[in-house]
Amino acid sequence: MKLAKIAVLAIALGSGSPSAFTTATRTAAVTIDYPEDGSIFPPEITPPTFLWRDSSASATSWRIDISFADGSAPIHALSKGERLRIGSIDPDCVADTNKPPALTPEEAAGHAWKPDPAMWAAIKKHSVNAAATVTISSGPRSRGSVRIRTSRDPVGAPIFYRDVPLMPSELERGVIKPLAESAVPLVAWRLRNLAEPRSHVVMRNLPVCANCHSFSADGKTMGMDLDGLENNRGLYFLANVKPEMSIANRDLIQWSTAKGVLKGSARIGFMSQVSPDGRFVVTTIDPLQAAGKSDSSNYYVANFKDYRFLQVFYPTRGILSWYSKAAGVLQPLPGADDPRFVQMGAVWSPDGKYLVFARAEAKDANPPGRPMAQFANDPNELPVKYDLYRIPFRDGKGGDPEPIEGASQDGMSNSFPRISPDGRWIVFVKARNGLLMRPDSQLYIVPATGGKARRMRSNTRLMNSWHSFSPNGRWLVFSSKARSPYTQMYLTHIDENGNDSPAILIENSTAANRAVNLPEFVNIPPDGLRSIGGPALEYFRWVNRAVYLQKHNRLAESIAMWRRALDLKPDDALAQRNLGMDLLMTGHRAEAGAHLQRAAELKLSAAVADHPEDAQTHEALGRMLLEHGKPDQALPNLHKAAELDPQSAAAHCDLGAALLALGRLDESLAELRKALALDARFAPAYYNLGLVLSRQGEADEAVRQWRKAIEINPQYKEVHDSLGSAFYARGNAAEALSHWRQGTSSPAALRQMAWLLATWPDQSLRNGQEAIALAVRASQLSDRNDPAVWDTLAAAYAEAGRFADAVLAAKRALALAERQNRPDLVTAIQSRIRLYEGNKPFRVSWNSGASRADRAPR
C-alpha cells in the first residue's frame, strides 16, 4: 500500500488547561495519547487523528505499523509527525470575555498523523473480528502501541447538535442569561453525518435562544424549547421533520396558553421531551402556586465571566406536566407534581409506558443573605442534589414515583437520565451539586430497574454530559471539555452488557473557538434534515431587527420591520404594541391608536384563554372590544361574564351596552333594567339606559336617566357629553356648553363646542378664538382627516375675522367630504365657502326643524 499522506492537524485543544493526554504505554519512549488503548470506532466514521509524544528530542520521522489479528497483511506508513495546530477560528466569536484556544507546552510537544481515507478503510475492514495494533516508532527502542477495533454496529444516524460561542454576559443575579445579547444570533444548529468529514448548518441567526431539543423514536417529530421575546421562556415548537423544515405559527406552543388546568402557570418550559411515538411532550414548568412569581424564585442561576464554565443553572422548584399534541392540552402528571419537590428533566422509556426524572427537595433559589457564586462549584452555590425516580405514565394518570437504586440517595447529584432504546440501561450524570455542565460531572450507567451504578470508562477528565443513545442503542454521544474549554463532542460504544469503550473525538464539529452541546442522534437518513426555517422563525428575526432599529431611534425603518413581523404573525401583541408606539412617535396618531388598541385586545384575549371561568376577565375584554367599536366581538365575552356572575350589575350593564351598539334595543333595555335591579345606584346603567331611550325617541326620559347618573357621579364625563347634545338639540346652547365643558374632551365634543362658539346666533355665547383652539385640538386628535372638524375650524376662523384662513380650511373640508362620499356635507360646505369668500361668517338658523347640517357638522 502507498504511504499515507501526511495530514495537517486542525483540531481545537485546550487553553492553559491541564493535559488531556492519557498514559498509554508509559514505559515506552513513544506515548500514544489518542486513540486510547481499547478504543472502538464505528464502521462509517472518517479517519481519526493519531496523537503521540516522543521522549527522544532528536526524532524527526516516525514509522507507523498497523498489524491485524485476522492474518491480513500489515499496513506501514511514514510520518514527519506534524506539530499540533489549533483549528480554524470564527472571528465573530472572538471577544474580550473569552480567550482563543491555545496549546499547553505538553500539547505543543506532541505529534499528529491521520491516515488517508483508503488506508483508514483498510484498517477498519481488518479490525472488526479482532483488534488492530497500531505501533508508532522513531527507532528500535522508541516505540508505543495501542489496540483499536472497528465495531460491527453502525451508528446508523446523524447527530443534531447546538454550536455556540462562549461569550459570557454580565453577571446578573437570578437572570438566565449565559450569553451576551449580541452573541445569541451567532448560535447555530448543525447535523453531522459521521461518514462525512464535516457537519452542515441547518439553522442559524435566531435572535432568541433555542435550546433543549428532542425527537420521536422514528425521527419524524421534533420539539424544541425556545426563549421567546421579552424574557418569555415558555415557548416551544413541535413540528414534523422534513429535509426542509418550515416552522409555522401553528407549530408554536405557548405553555401558559395551552388548554388544560395549568393555564397561566407555565412561565418556563424546561428540558421538554417528545414521547417515542411523537404524541406527547413532557416538560418541567413552575409549580401551580408559584404562578406569577419571578423566574428567579424557581431557578438557581449564576452567570460568570469565566468563559470556560460561564453559567450555573438548575431548577429549585418545578413540576412535570405533559402535553397532548392531538388535544392541545397541558396537564400536571400526578405523582410528579408535588410542590414539596422540584421534579424535572424527565425522559420517556422506549415504549412510552414510564418516565425517569430527577427530583430534589424544593427550596428558594435565592435565600436572603446567601452570597452569589463566583465560579462553577463555588461553595457558595445553593446546594441541590437530585435523585433519579421512575414513574408510570399511564396515559397521563401518573402514579407513585420510585427512586432508582444506584442513582439516588447516594450523597451526590444525579441528573440528565437517558434510557437505552432496548430499555435495559440508564446513563446519567453524577456530580457533587446541581446538574449538567459541572466540572466534575461524570457519566454513570445503571440497570433501568435499578442496581449498582458503574462509572463509564469513556469519561474524560473534565465535564461529561449532554449524552444521547444512537437508535440501535450501541453508541452514546456526549460532550466534554477534556481537550478544550470550547466543548467538544465524543462517542463511545456500549455492548449488550453495558460495557463502554474509551471516548472517540468527533473531529471538525465546529470552529476551534466555538462549543458543541446538546448532541442528539436523530433516526433519519444522512440528508433527512437540511434546513430549519419558516415564518415562525423569520418572525423572531424581523422583531429582533425592529428592536435594534427602535433602540437607535431609526423609527421609519423599525416601523417597516414591525410590519413585516405582523405579516407573519398578525395576532402578536408585542409587534402590535411596538408598531403602535413607533407610529405614535412619528405622528401617525390614528394608525397608532388602532395598533395599540389591538395589542391591548390581544393581551386580554390571552388572559381570557388562561382564565376561561373568570367573569371579570371576560368582562374586561368585552368592555375593551366595545370601546374599540367591536360590539359583535364583545358580545360573546359579555354574555359569558353575565352568565358566570349573574349578580354583577356591571356585567349586565356592559352586556346591555353591547346590545345597544348592535341596535338590539329591547334586549339592551332588559339587561340594563337587570343591572339597576341589582344596584339602583349604578351610574353607567342610567347612562346606557338614557342612550337606549334616546334611540327610541324618548328624549325627555333619556335626559331624566342621565340626570340620575350625574346625581350619583357628578364627574361622569360621557353623561355630560350626552346632556350637552340633548340640550343643544333643544336650543339651550348655554346649558349644552356647560355640560360639554365638563365632558370628555373627545374630538366630537371639542368639535361641537367649537361649532357652537363659532356659529350660535347669540353673540354673548360666541368666542372665535376659543372656537379656533378647540377645533385645532379636535383636528389633532382626529389625525386631521375629519371633514366635519375642518368645516368647524373654517367657521371658527370666519367668526374671528380670518376669512382667508376660513376659505382654505373649508376647501380642505370639502375635499375630504368629497373623498369620503358625504354629499349632504359637501352641499353645506359649498354654501359656507361662498359666505367666507364674501367675508361673512356662518350662523346657524336654529329651530327644531333645522337641518342637521345647519346645526352642527357631523
Residue ranges and their predicted role:
Residues 553-564, 585-603, 616, 627-640, ...:
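Structural signature of tandem alpha-helical TPR/SEL1-like repeats
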Residues 568, 602, 610, 644, ...:
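Structural marker of alpha-solenoid helical repeat scaffolds
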Residues 515-532, 539, 593, 762-766, ...:
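Terminal, low-structured helical/coil segments at or just beyond the last alpha-helical repeat
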Residues 623, 657, 691, 748-789:
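Alpha-helical adaptor scaffolds
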